[in-house]
Amino acid sequence: MTIGIIGAMEEEVELLKNTMPHVEEVVIGGAKFYVGEIAGKEVVLLESGIGKVNAAIGTTLLADRFKPEIIINTGSAGGMAEGLAVGDVIISDRLAYGDVDVTEFGYTYGQVPRMPAFYQGDAVLLKKAETIYRDYFSQSENKAVYGLVITNDSFIMRPDQHELIRTFFPDVKAVEMEAAAIAQVAYQFDIPFLIIRAISDLANQEATISFDEFIHLAAKQSATCIIELLKTI
């Protein structure tokens, strides 16, 4: 079994790459693929670049060239739900776009025409994650949260951005810039997927400062959770 793991930035894939004893690097169209093993599993680790288009290009190349049987997305996210703290982990059971509006043609806000309104994380992987992280976080000051993640091609930090997202997605847990695009490609290639991200900021007016300060913490937390999951696959 080959498992695809995707992060947008070097900071989000570096720790995982460093656990691979032997790495083959392949660069296609600016996307960096690292082929090797993590936790005894065959892995293709992708540094896709930031944003929905980069994520979609990279995920498509991953699916077409490397044929993964599972895709997992790692990295950071901005927390939107009450009670979330930096270092908490969000496992997405659903994803949607926060900046797509074709409602005039009868689609749900966030829905790309002829695509689902929401992309569902794989039920089997979600169940595994729930079991693993219940034990993993029982001794931690942080926690794992499950729910809706919204993807935008914007860094969310202003009140008006919050208001728009909450208007259409009142149960949103976190926001970021790639996951729904990854999910859409996985859906179109019929590949089971799971999104696991750690909170680097609270998507507020201090978000840029928090992100710069805590991106490495979030990357470490997310990478650790993915390694724990890989041990069970």
From Swiss-Prot:
Q: Which UniProt keywords apply?
A: Amino-acid biosynthesis, Hydrolase, Methionine biosynthesis
| GO terms, biological process | L-methionine salvage from methylthioadenosine; L-methionine salvage from S-adenosylmethionine; nucleoside catabolic process
Cite the binding residues for substrate. Answer: 78, 156, 177-178
Whether Hydrolase counts among this entry's keywords is: yes
Molecular function (GO) terms for this protein are: adenosylhomocysteine nucleosidase activity; methylthioadenosine nucleosidase activity
List the record's Gene Ontology CC terms alphabetically. cytosol
Q: Which domain of life is it from?
A: Bacteria
Pathway it belongs to? Amino-acid biosynthesis; L-methionine biosynthesis via salvage pathway; S-methyl-5-thio-alpha-D-ribose 1-phosphate from S-methyl-5'-thioadenosine (hydrolase route): step 1/2
Q: Which reaction does it catalyse?
A: S-adenosyl-L-homocysteine + H2O = S-(5-deoxy-D-ribos-5-yl)-L-homocysteine + adenine; S-methyl-5'-thioadenosine + H2O = 5-(methylsulfanyl)-D-ribose + adenine; 5'-deoxyadenosine + H2O = 5-deoxy-D-ribose + adenine
Class of this enzyme: hydrolase
Q: Name one Pfam family in it.
A: PNP_UDP_1
Instruction: Supply the EC number(s).
Output: 3.2.2.9
Entry keyword Hydrolase: yes
> Which residues are the active-site ones?
12 (proton acceptor), 201 (proton donor)
Record CDD domains:
MTAN (cd09008)
Name the family the entry cites. Answer: Belongs to the PNP/UDP phosphorylase family. MtnN subfamily.
**Matches recorded under PANTHER family:** 5'-METHYLTHIOADENOSINE/S-ADENOSYLHOMOCYSTEINE NUCLEOSIDASE, 5'-METHYLTHIOADENOSINE_S-ADENOSYLHOMOCYSTEINE NUCLEOSIDASE
NCBIfam families per record: MTA_SAH-Nsdase, PRK05584.1
Record function comment: Catalyzes the irreversible cleavage of the glycosidic bond in both 5'-methylthioadenosine (MTA) and S-adenosylhomocysteine (SAH/AdoHcy) to adenine and the corresponding thioribose, 5'-methylthioribose and S-ribosylhomocysteine, respectively. Also cleaves 5'-deoxyadenosine, a toxic by-product of radical S-adenosylmethionine (SAM) enzymes, into 5-deoxyribose and adenine.
Instruction: Give the protein's recorded name.
Output: 5'-methylthioadenosine/S-adenosylhomocysteine nucleosidase
Query: Origin organism of this chain?
Result: Listeria welshimeri serovar 6b (strain ATCC 35897 / DSM 20650 / CCUG 15529 / CIP 8149 / NCTC 11857 / SLCC 5334 / V8)
What taxonomic lineage is listed for the species of origin?
Bacteria, Bacillati, Bacillota, Bacilli, Bacillales
The record's gene field reads mtnN
